[in-house]
Amino acid sequence: MSSTEKNLLDPGFELTLRPMRYPDFYERYRDAIKNTWTVEEVDLHSDVADLAKLTPGEQHMIGRLVAFFATGDSIVSNNLVLTLYKHINSPEARLYLSRQLFEEAVHVQFYLTLLDTYLPDLEDRAAAFDAVENIPSIREKAQFCFKWMDSVEKLDRLETKADRRRFLLNLICFAACIEGLFFYGAFAYVYWFRSRGLLHGLATGTNWVFRDETMHMSFAFEVVDTVRKEEPELFDDLLQEQVTAMLREAVEAELQFGRDLCGEGLPGMNTDSMRQYLECVADQRLQRLGFAPVYGSENPFSFMELQGVQELTNFFERRPSAYQVAVEGTVDFDEDF
């Protein structure tokens, strides 16, 4: 079988970049290289003063947030290495996944810096790093991830339709639920603080993480689109039922986390509004995957509308050009190259 006849999830380890089968994945890699940032660019000095202004409820929220961030990106990085890189059989896609792994490492470094800055007490830091074990609302989210993602870890090859379906569920959980729902929920709390003029350093770093995570999610959805074209028989009623159930579970797990963060409610942020927001996001993910929405909720947070549209596309353009790594030149994708 020639390289041009292989499908994206066919077993093997394709190494040949010429001719390119999936040039769009390569372009995503190039775009990611242009948007390089470092933790050292994030100034957290003003955040220290802001932390002293927060109420006990708000301080509790921040502690839970940074604990989740550190835990969540570690789960993401492990899945990249153990599952996605192994089974997405495209050198172009693996270039992007290599870049994504670097970005996830930067995110972990950012969250490590947040923990060291926001939690001066060493015991508080240790508890945050061990959040999966000692914070029930974060443990519930981790258990959700393991339920939907771990079944692929021991698969060496995607030989059967059932194997490939399991991989798709892993990928969709990774993109739509972890990066596309859990992190989007956490970002909403960050931008709620920013809308009140607080924690600008956290918001700045989150801007760049938001950008990265959105690109990661978009790449994963393009992988799903490609598999749908190559193997449409995988996308049957059963898969739709499984994905819909997965998103429903993700909303409930994230809402439990929201109850932990918000308690009885804070001015402008409560569990009712967060449920509406999460349901809106879940519907968006289902529609992007080609499935029917189930909630019909609208986004209640105006500060997230701004973030999702204007800032997501423009904030890199506003950064000093010295921080943006340009990639010059073009690549000819002609198969006769």
Regions found by a protein language model. Give the residues of each.
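Non-heme di-metal
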Residues: 1-337
